[in-house]
Design a protein with these regions (language model features):
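N-terminal and secondary-structure boundary signal
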Residues: 2-137
């Protein structure tokens, strides 16, 4: 079951008269799985429940912003989850690609070439995700 929770907007925005403030719907699910549904399948179901199908992706580029992780660290979503998002966007007619911006600090993501190397080292490649990596340098 996918649960829904209403979350309020930033109160500063609510003070502006010319802005219509609506509550955002936030969707979440348990990380527990069963024999009939694994985590990538749950992610796909969550995206569809949240309404990704109502977005017009037909022949449009779709930047999927993701943190590729620093080389040697594990604090990033794995490529198999990115592949699920890419698959759904492509099924809806979109031209998906993964992207992230470089860092200001010195490290493995300080420029586009090193950043792409970091992404590939952490498993983000066209073969594992189904789309290209483009660094917004």
């Amino acid at each position: 079951m996918i649960d829904k929770k209403e979350v309020g907007m930033n109160p500063v925005c609510a003070e502006k008269e010319d802005m219509k403030v609506e509550k955002s719907k936030v969707y979440f699910t348990s990380m527990k799985t069963s024999f009939s549904e694994n985590l990538p399948q749950k992610l796909e179901r969550l995206m569809k429940t949240a309404g990704i199908g109502s977005i017009d992706f037909k022949n449009k580029y779709a930047a999927i912003k993701i943190h590729f992780g620093e080389p040697g660290n594990l604090a990033f979503l794995r490529p198999n989850y990115a592949a699920v998002v890419v698959k759904v966007v492509k099924e809806l007619g979109g031209k998906a690609f993964l992207t992230d911006c470089n860092t200001l600090y010195v490290g493995g993501r300080k420029n586009a070439l090193d950043h792409m190397d970091a992404a590939y080292q952490n498993g983000f490649s066209p073969f594992s995700t189904g789309c290209h990596v483009i660094i917004a340098d």
